[in-house]
Amino acid sequence: MGQKVNPYGFRLGITTDHVSRWFSDSTKKGQRYSDYVAEDVRIRTMLKTSLDRAGVARIEIERTRDRVRVDIYTARPGIVIGRRGVEAERIRADLEKLTGKQIQLNILEVKNPEAEAQLVAQGIAEQLAGRVAFRRAMRKGLQGAQRAGAKGVRIQVSGRLGGAEMSRSEFYREGRVPLHTLRANIDYGFYEARTSFGRIGVKVWVYKGDITNKDLAREQANQKSSRPERRNDRSDGRTGDRRTNAPRTAPAAEAAPVAAAGVEA
Protein backbone atom coordinates (compact mmCIF):
# COMPACT_ATOMS: atom_id res chain seq x y z
CA MET A 1 0.00 0.00 0.00
CA GLY A 2 2.75 2.44 0.93
CA GLN A 3 4.46 1.87 -2.41
CA LYS A 4 1.44 3.06 -4.41
CA VAL A 5 -0.35 5.73 -2.39
CA ASN A 6 0.71 9.37 -2.31
CA PRO A 7 2.88 9.86 0.82
CA TYR A 8 1.11 13.12 1.72
CA GLY A 9 -2.39 11.63 1.60
CA PHE A 10 -1.23 8.50 3.46
CA ARG A 11 0.02 10.62 6.40
CA LEU A 12 -2.59 13.39 6.27
CA GLY A 13 -3.73 14.29 9.77
CA ILE A 14 -0.92 12.25 11.34
CA THR A 15 2.34 13.95 10.41
CA THR A 16 1.29 16.19 7.50
CA ASP A 17 -1.20 19.05 7.23
CA HIS A 18 -3.54 20.18 4.46
CA VAL A 19 -2.11 22.54 1.83
CA SER A 20 -5.56 24.16 1.51
CA ARG A 21 -7.13 25.26 4.80
CA TRP A 22 -10.73 26.53 4.75
CA PHE A 23 -14.29 25.44 5.50
CA SER A 24 -17.48 25.84 3.50
CA ASP A 25 -21.03 24.57 4.01
CA SER A 26 -22.77 27.26 1.96
CA THR A 27 -25.09 26.52 -0.94
CA LYS A 28 -24.68 29.99 -2.46
CA LYS A 29 -23.06 30.06 -5.89
CA GLY A 30 -19.40 31.02 -5.67
CA GLN A 31 -19.14 29.99 -2.01
CA ARG A 32 -19.79 26.27 -2.30
CA TYR A 33 -17.20 23.64 -1.46
CA SER A 34 -16.82 22.67 -5.12
CA ASP A 35 -16.33 26.32 -6.11
CA TYR A 36 -13.48 26.74 -3.63
CA VAL A 37 -11.81 23.51 -4.78
CA ALA A 38 -11.97 24.58 -8.44
CA GLU A 39 -10.66 28.03 -7.51
CA ASP A 40 -7.71 26.49 -5.63
CA VAL A 41 -6.85 24.42 -8.71
CA ARG A 42 -6.93 27.53 -10.91
CA ILE A 43 -4.71 29.44 -8.46
CA ARG A 44 -2.10 26.66 -8.34
CA THR A 45 -2.14 26.17 -12.12
CA MET A 46 -1.66 29.89 -12.78
CA LEU A 47 1.20 30.21 -10.27
CA LYS A 48 3.02 27.10 -11.50
CA THR A 49 2.74 28.31 -15.10
CA SER A 50 3.89 31.87 -14.46
CA LEU A 51 6.61 30.89 -11.94
CA ASP A 52 8.02 27.92 -13.82
CA ARG A 53 11.62 29.16 -13.44
CA ALA A 54 11.30 30.32 -9.82
CA GLY A 55 11.73 26.89 -8.21
CA VAL A 56 8.36 26.72 -6.43
CA ALA A 57 8.37 23.87 -3.91
CA ARG A 58 4.76 24.13 -2.71
CA ILE A 59 1.79 26.50 -2.50
CA GLU A 60 -0.48 26.77 0.54
CA ILE A 61 -3.89 28.47 0.50
CA GLU A 62 -5.91 29.64 3.49
CA ARG A 63 -9.27 31.41 3.30
CA THR A 64 -11.22 33.72 5.58
CA ARG A 65 -14.56 35.41 4.95
CA ASP A 66 -13.34 37.98 2.41
CA ARG A 67 -9.62 37.29 2.04
CA VAL A 68 -7.43 34.57 0.53
CA ARG A 69 -3.93 34.03 1.88
CA VAL A 70 -1.46 32.43 -0.55
CA ASP A 71 1.93 31.22 0.72
CA ILE A 72 4.54 30.51 -1.97
CA TYR A 73 7.59 28.48 -0.90
CA THR A 74 10.33 29.07 -3.46
CA ALA A 75 14.06 28.52 -3.82
CA ARG A 76 14.45 31.79 -5.76
CA PRO A 77 12.42 34.47 -3.99
CA GLY A 78 14.12 37.23 -5.99
CA ILE A 79 12.44 36.03 -9.19
CA VAL A 80 9.01 35.96 -7.52
CA ILE A 81 9.39 39.39 -5.87
CA GLY A 82 11.07 41.11 -8.80
CA ARG A 83 12.79 44.48 -8.79
CA ARG A 84 11.21 46.70 -6.11
CA GLY A 85 8.37 44.20 -5.73
CA VAL A 86 6.96 44.73 -9.23
CA GLU A 87 6.58 41.01 -9.97
CA ALA A 88 4.88 40.32 -6.62
CA GLU A 89 2.38 43.12 -7.23
CA ARG A 90 1.63 41.72 -10.69
CA ILE A 91 1.00 38.25 -9.21
CA ARG A 92 -1.26 39.70 -6.53
CA ALA A 93 -3.25 41.67 -9.12
CA ASP A 94 -3.67 38.57 -11.31
CA LEU A 95 -4.87 36.52 -8.33
CA GLU A 96 -7.36 39.21 -7.28
CA LYS A 97 -8.69 39.34 -10.84
CA LEU A 98 -8.98 35.53 -10.87
CA THR A 99 -10.72 35.17 -7.49
CA GLY A 100 -12.47 38.51 -7.07
CA LYS A 101 -11.26 38.65 -3.45
CA GLN A 102 -8.54 40.43 -1.52
CA ILE A 103 -5.24 38.51 -1.73
CA GLN A 104 -2.59 38.33 0.98
CA LEU A 105 0.57 37.10 -0.76
CA ASN A 106 3.44 35.68 1.31
CA ILE A 107 6.70 34.68 -0.39
CA LEU A 108 8.83 32.32 1.73
CA GLU A 109 12.33 31.07 0.93
CA VAL A 110 13.18 27.36 0.97
CA LYS A 111 16.32 27.04 3.07
CA ASN A 112 17.52 23.69 1.71
CA PRO A 113 16.35 23.34 -1.92
CA GLU A 114 18.51 20.28 -2.70
CA ALA A 115 16.52 18.25 -0.13
CA GLU A 116 13.09 19.35 -1.43
CA ALA A 117 11.58 16.50 -3.45
CA GLN A 118 9.59 18.76 -5.78
CA LEU A 119 12.65 20.84 -6.65
CA VAL A 120 14.79 17.71 -7.16
CA ALA A 121 12.17 16.28 -9.54
CA GLN A 122 11.95 19.56 -11.45
CA GLY A 123 15.75 19.74 -11.76
CA ILE A 124 15.95 16.20 -13.16
CA ALA A 125 13.10 16.91 -15.60
CA GLU A 126 14.84 20.03 -16.88
CA GLN A 127 18.02 18.02 -17.48
CA LEU A 128 16.06 15.36 -19.38
CA ALA A 129 14.48 18.08 -21.53
CA GLY A 130 18.03 19.32 -22.22
CA ARG A 131 19.02 15.87 -23.60
CA VAL A 132 21.10 14.83 -20.57
CA ALA A 133 21.32 11.05 -20.08
CA PHE A 134 18.63 9.98 -17.61
CA ARG A 135 20.97 7.84 -15.47
CA ARG A 136 23.41 10.71 -15.12
CA ALA A 137 20.60 13.11 -14.13
CA MET A 138 19.26 10.63 -11.56
CA ARG A 139 22.68 10.07 -9.97
CA LYS A 140 23.24 13.82 -9.77
CA GLY A 141 19.90 14.28 -8.00
CA LEU A 142 20.70 11.46 -5.55
CA GLN A 143 24.10 12.88 -4.67
CA GLY A 144 22.76 16.41 -4.20
CA ALA A 145 19.98 15.28 -1.84
CA GLN A 146 22.37 13.18 0.23
CA ARG A 147 24.81 16.08 0.55
CA ALA A 148 21.90 18.23 1.77
CA GLY A 149 21.30 15.85 4.69
CA ALA A 150 18.61 13.46 3.42
CA LYS A 151 18.66 10.04 5.10
CA GLY A 152 17.29 8.30 2.04
CA VAL A 153 16.32 9.13 -1.55
CA ARG A 154 14.42 7.24 -4.22
CA ILE A 155 14.09 8.56 -7.79
CA GLN A 156 11.97 6.95 -10.50
CA VAL A 157 11.64 7.94 -14.15
CA SER A 158 9.04 6.53 -16.55
CA GLY A 159 8.61 6.95 -20.29
CA ARG A 160 10.59 6.48 -23.49
CA LEU A 161 13.95 6.56 -21.76
CA GLY A 162 16.82 7.30 -24.11
CA GLY A 163 14.41 7.48 -27.06
CA ALA A 164 13.51 3.77 -26.84
CA GLU A 165 10.53 2.51 -28.82
CA MET A 166 8.88 0.95 -25.76
CA SER A 167 8.39 2.92 -22.55
CA ARG A 168 9.69 1.57 -19.26
CA SER A 169 10.46 2.63 -15.68
CA GLU A 170 13.76 2.74 -13.84
CA PHE A 171 14.58 3.86 -10.31
CA TYR A 172 17.60 4.42 -8.10
CA ARG A 173 17.62 4.39 -4.32
CA GLU A 174 20.18 5.40 -1.73
CA GLY A 175 19.67 4.96 2.01
CA ARG A 176 16.36 4.10 3.71
CA VAL A 177 12.98 5.18 2.34
CA PRO A 178 10.35 3.60 4.68
CA LEU A 179 7.11 4.34 2.82
CA HIS A 180 4.95 2.20 5.17
CA THR A 181 6.08 3.95 8.38
CA LEU A 182 3.59 6.67 9.27
CA ARG A 183 5.95 8.56 11.58
CA ALA A 184 8.54 8.83 8.78
CA ASN A 185 8.90 12.32 7.31
CA ILE A 186 8.66 11.54 3.58
CA ASP A 187 8.80 14.41 1.11
CA TYR A 188 7.33 13.61 -2.32
CA GLY A 189 7.59 15.42 -5.63
CA PHE A 190 6.48 14.84 -9.22
CA TYR A 191 7.30 16.63 -12.46
CA GLU A 192 6.97 15.90 -16.18
CA ALA A 193 9.76 16.44 -18.69
CA ARG A 194 8.65 17.34 -22.21
CA THR A 195 11.12 15.79 -24.64
CA SER A 196 11.11 15.22 -28.39
CA PHE A 197 10.25 11.54 -27.74
CA GLY A 198 7.29 12.36 -25.50
CA ARG A 199 6.76 13.07 -21.84
CA ILE A 200 8.88 11.47 -19.13
CA GLY A 201 7.52 11.41 -15.57
CA VAL A 202 9.91 11.96 -12.66
CA LYS A 203 8.97 10.93 -9.11
CA VAL A 204 11.14 11.65 -6.07
CA TRP A 205 10.83 10.44 -2.47
CA VAL A 206 13.10 12.01 0.16
CA TYR A 207 13.31 10.54 3.68
CA LYS A 208 14.25 13.22 6.22
CA GLY A 209 13.96 11.17 9.42
CA ASP A 210 11.19 10.26 11.85
CA ILE A 211 8.85 12.85 13.34
CA THR A 212 8.64 12.57 17.14
CA ASN A 213 5.77 13.78 19.31
CA LYS A 214 7.80 16.84 20.33
CA ASP A 215 8.46 17.78 16.70
CA LEU A 216 4.77 17.36 15.82
CA ALA A 217 3.65 19.48 18.80
CA ARG A 218 6.17 22.19 17.84
CA GLU A 219 4.90 22.31 14.24
CA GLN A 220 1.27 22.53 15.36
CA ALA A 221 2.13 25.34 17.80
CA ASN A 222 3.91 27.28 15.05
CA GLN A 223 0.92 26.90 12.72
CA LYS A 224 -1.51 28.13 15.40
CA SER A 225 0.65 31.15 16.20
CA SER A 226 0.88 32.11 12.51
CA ARG A 227 -2.91 32.07 12.00
CA PRO A 228 -4.99 35.16 12.90
CA GLU A 229 -7.11 34.90 16.03
CA ARG A 230 -10.87 34.71 15.58
CA ARG A 231 -13.19 37.12 17.35
CA ASN A 232 -15.26 35.69 20.16
CA ASP A 233 -17.34 38.43 21.77
CA ARG A 234 -19.07 36.06 24.16
CA SER A 235 -16.20 33.81 25.14
CA ASP A 236 -16.79 34.35 28.87
CA GLY A 237 -20.50 33.57 28.68
CA ARG A 238 -21.62 37.08 29.68
CA THR A 239 -24.60 38.86 28.17
CA GLY A 240 -25.37 42.53 28.21
CA ASP A 241 -25.10 45.81 26.40
CA ARG A 242 -21.83 45.78 24.38
CA ARG A 243 -21.67 49.57 24.31
CA THR A 244 -21.74 50.05 28.10
CA ASN A 245 -20.57 46.53 29.06
CA ALA A 246 -23.33 46.55 31.70
CA PRO A 247 -25.11 43.30 32.55
CA ARG A 248 -28.60 43.02 31.15
CA THR A 249 -31.33 42.29 33.73
CA ALA A 250 -34.73 40.74 33.15
CA PRO A 251 -37.70 43.15 33.23
CA ALA A 252 -39.80 43.12 36.39
CA ALA A 253 -43.02 41.17 36.19
CA GLU A 254 -46.19 43.24 36.23
CA ALA A 255 -48.76 42.56 38.93
CA ALA A 256 -51.84 40.78 37.67
CA PRO A 257 -55.19 42.64 38.10
CA VAL A 258 -57.24 41.43 41.10
CA ALA A 259 -60.98 40.92 40.56
CA ALA A 260 -63.44 42.62 42.99
CA ALA A 261 -64.75 40.30 45.66
CA GLY A 262 -68.19 41.89 46.05
CA VAL A 263 -70.96 42.69 43.60
CA GLU A 264 -72.45 46.15 43.33
CA ALA A 265 -75.96 46.44 44.66
Curated annotation (Swiss-Prot):
Listed Basic and acidic residues bias regions: 226-244
Residue ranges of the region described as Disordered: 217-265
GO terms for biological process, alphabetical: translation
Residues passing through the membrane, by range: none
PANTHER family (UniProt xref): 30S/40S RIBOSOMAL PROTEIN S3, SMALL RIBOSOMAL SUBUNIT PROTEIN US3C
Quaternary structure annotation from Swiss-Prot or TrEMBL: Part of the 30S ribosomal subunit. Forms a tight complex with proteins S10 and S14.
NCBIfam families: rpsC_bact (TIGR01009)
Protein name: Small ribosomal subunit protein uS3
UniProt organism field: Clavibacter michiganensis subsp. michiganensis (strain NCPPB 382)
